[in-house]
């Protein structure tokens, strides 16, 4: 790893955000194999790219970014898709559920996360200008359900540029409004 395990006394965790790519809850690169190393050295056996990458991480955030493959799926199917993603041992967090635009059973999924010791992410990008009010309201419902059922959350900026790192003011405000 490029970063040390600790830096100025703070333990650094290495993570990756990975797309859920189908209704079975599989993560990106679950089906991509390779059998050569970086220097064209032949490996003893083929490796699965997704497992190889996630094996170097402390955790993964499983998220939806493209949902065309879920067109016509039922609420039950979408809920099960997320549950299946949680079966991946690398997945610790389900990412930005409020803006996925997919209909799932919020209490059922929150209970599943709670019971498995997994987290649900809330991030600032969902609150950015141009995001639909429905996504922000959906985040509120998810956060309230997490509070009611005792599911832990993670929150952050979802920064895609250095100037946005640690900017989570709208998420913090929304969470503070939930008692």
Predicted feature locations:
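Extended substrate/RNA-proximal surfaces in nucleic-acid metabolism proteins
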Residues: 1-118, 176
């Amino acid at each position: 790893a490029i970063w040390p395990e600790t830096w100025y006394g703070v333990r650094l965790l290495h993570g990756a955000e990975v797309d859920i790519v189908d209704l079975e809850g599989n993560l990106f690169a679950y089906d991509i194999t390779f059998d050569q190393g970086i220097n064209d050295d032949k490996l003893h056996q083929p490796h699965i790219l997704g497992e190889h990458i996630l094996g170097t991480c402390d955790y993964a955030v499983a998220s939806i970014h493209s949902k065309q493959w879920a067109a016509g799926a039922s609420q039950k199917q979408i809920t099960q898709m997320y549950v299946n993603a949680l079966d991946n041992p690398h997945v610790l967090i389900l990412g930005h559920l409020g803006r996925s635009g997919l209909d799932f059973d919020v209490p059922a999924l929150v209970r599943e996360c709670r019971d498995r010791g997994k987290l649900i992410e809330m991030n600032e990008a969902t609150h950015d200008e141009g995001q639909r009010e429905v996504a922000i309201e959906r985040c509120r419902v998810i956060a309230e359900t997490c509070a009611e059922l005792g599911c832990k959350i993670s929150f952050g900026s979802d920064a895609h540029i250095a100037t946005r790192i640690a900017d989570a003011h709208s998420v913090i405000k929304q969470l503070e409004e939930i008692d």
